């Protein structure tokens, strides 16, 4: 599978090429921007459950993955208690799938090898349109507030004081599907500061937020655009000395990672999956220890809650055209 986008993300999505088994005879139905493998009859912008019962799945083992913002091994331990809760609630075995890239995660869901996932905020639209991902939840604080900001960071002793100073420098981004790691900063730098990629600054890609952050800490990168949710968690874990970096820009608040399921998952199983999320006991859990500002999972409406991110995609020329 290849994505044709005005922002070329061939490298980021190379894992989509040469997938088989999912592209069956296509149904003539409303689908909006969804890939031709899916239908959207109710207009919620996500893929409907297949009308053919043979395409509905109820696996004996559920595969779960979390967006690869840092070393997957770190988060496998963080999610262990949640996975046990998911097993208890669904009555299924659950396996954690440690993905190394966003593209690998989307590919796994599209090809039927991933059933439940936490997908990076900026990648939700891509996963929805091209992998049949149906987001239904995100983390929120006890008072129901949620979200994160994009920050541009530099080494503490850098001569770069504000975004306009980035002209003529290299900026580290994570990958082309990331909202805070690429799409939002690209749009903001162009719209608010008149800085265009390749014309005014040289973009480089680190692959993940932690790579970008540590690259600035170690002065491998002159600047980096990152999600401050990841940044703050790394600071809280004392992964690095926060005195070694400085923030020169902080954006408006964006929705954070979306949690969802494969569109063809059995509806009765989906209800159990949702129950496992919304009734998960946060108090004393590893999730509470890692995501300290969060206190629960709350329902989301992809059509409404991701509108701002789809607008950023539109502004930066992203088109969800899957082949």
Map each language-model feature to its residues.
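Periplasmic-binding protein-like
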Residues: 67, 142-151, 239-277, 292-312
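Acidic, polar ligand-binding/catalytic clefts
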Residues: 107-165
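Short helices/loops that flank or line small-molecule/ion binding pockets
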Residues: 103-117, 130, 164, 209-229
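Short beta-strand-to-loop elements that line the ligand-binding cleft
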Residues: 93-100, 198-208, 246-249
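Bilobed "Venus flytrap"/periplasmic-binding protein-like clamshell domains
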Residues: 64-87, 122, 145-214, 229
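A ligand-binding cleft/hinge motif common to bilobed small-molecule-binding domains
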Residues: 121-132, 185-191, 215-218, 222-242
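Bacterial N-terminal signal peptides
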Residues: 10-18
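N-terminal hydrophobic or amphipathic helices and topogenic motifs
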Residues: 2, 23-104, 289-323
């Amino acid at each position: 599978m290849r994505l044709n986008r005005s922002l070329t993300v061939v490298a980021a999505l190379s894992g989509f090429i040469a997938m088989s088994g999912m592209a069956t005879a296509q149904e003539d139905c409303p689908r909006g921007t969804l890939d031709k493998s899916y239908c959207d009859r109710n207009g919620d912008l996500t893929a409907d459950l297949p009308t053919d019962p043979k395409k509905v799945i109820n696996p004996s083992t559920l595969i779960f993955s979390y967006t690869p913002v840092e070393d997957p091994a770190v988060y496998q331990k963080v999610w262990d208690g949640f996975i046990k809760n998911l097993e208890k609630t669904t009555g299924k075995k659950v396996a954690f799938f440690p993905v190394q890239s966003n593209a690998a995660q989307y590919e796994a869901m599209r090809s039927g090898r991933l059933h439940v996932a936490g997908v990076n905020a900026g990648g939700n639209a891509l996963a929805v349109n091209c992998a049949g991902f149906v987001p239904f939840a995100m983390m929120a604080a006890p008072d129901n507030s949620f979200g994160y900001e994009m920050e541009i960071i530099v080494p503490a002793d850098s001569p770069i004081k504000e975004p306009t100073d980035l002209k003529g420098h290299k900026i580290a981004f994570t990958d082309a599907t990331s909202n805070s790691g690429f799409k939002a900063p690209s749009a903001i730098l162009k719209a608010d500061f008149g800085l265009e990629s390749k014309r005014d600054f040289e973009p480089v890609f680190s692959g993940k937020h932690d790579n970008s952050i540590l690259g600035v800490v170690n002065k491998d990168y002159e600047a980096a655009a990152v999600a401050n949710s990841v940044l703050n968690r790394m600071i809280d874990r004392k992964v690095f000395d926060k005195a070694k970096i400085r923030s020169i820009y902080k954006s408006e608040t964006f929705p954070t990672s979306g949690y969802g399921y494969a569109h063809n998952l059995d509806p009765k199983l989906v209800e159990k999956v949702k129950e496992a999320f919304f009734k998960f006991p946060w108090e004393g859990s590893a999730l509470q220890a890692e995501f300290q500002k969060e206190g629960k999972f709350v329902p989301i409406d992809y059509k409404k809650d991701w509108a701002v991110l789809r607008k950023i995609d539109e502004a930066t020329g992203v088109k969800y055209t899957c082949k």
